[in-house]
């Protein structure tokens, strides 16, 4: 496959996995409320006085991302192991974003454009590019589309009382 060609099927599959993994914690919180809501950082604070990650990063959300991604993969005829790795990498990118934002002194659920979407999308797309048949252009397009989805859909989800913030 030429680097200049865009494989829209692979991009759509990857975008579906990204949306699935990243919406799973939000939807699960909406369904379960505070039940089974244990923070990944176990309330750990670092020497800067800020939490390692914060209350919004939970084991429930992490496992929900894996579960929703596997369901999505099965619907797309992808291997469940790819979906599992994808979700773990996406959530690792999300945790990295939260860690960086806490070190910047930003409160939980604060918005930092780019930092909120790039690590959680770049990490799985880049590390699983062969398994997902993505080239550099496909990865760039997918990240751009994911960013646009987040920017356009988040305010709507906020108005529908699904998200706590409009971003």
What role is predicted for each listed range?
Residues 1-84, 91, 95-127, 133-167:
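Interhelical loop and helix-boundary elements at the membrane-water interface
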């Amino acid at each position: 496959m030429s680097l200049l060609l865009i494989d829209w099927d692979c991009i759509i599959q990857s975008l579906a996995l990204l949306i699935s993994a990243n919406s799973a914690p939000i939807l699960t919180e909406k369904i379960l409320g505070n039940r089974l809501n244990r923070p990944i950082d176990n309330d750990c604070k670092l020497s800067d006085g800020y939490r390692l990650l914060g209350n919004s990063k939970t084991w429930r959300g992490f496992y929900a991302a894996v579960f929703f991604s596997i369901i999505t993969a099965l619907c797309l005829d992808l291997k469940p192991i790819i979906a599992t790795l994808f979700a773990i990498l996406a959530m690792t990118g999300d945790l990295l974003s939260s860690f960086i934002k806490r070190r910047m002194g930003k409160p939980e659920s604060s918005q930092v454009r780019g930092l909120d979407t790039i690590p959680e999308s770049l990490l799985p797309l880049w590390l699983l590019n062969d398994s997902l048949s993505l080239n550099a252009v496909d990865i760039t397009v997918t990240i751009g589309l994911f960013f646009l989805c987040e920017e356009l859909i988040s305010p709507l989800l906020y108005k529908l009382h699904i998200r706590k913030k409009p971003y």
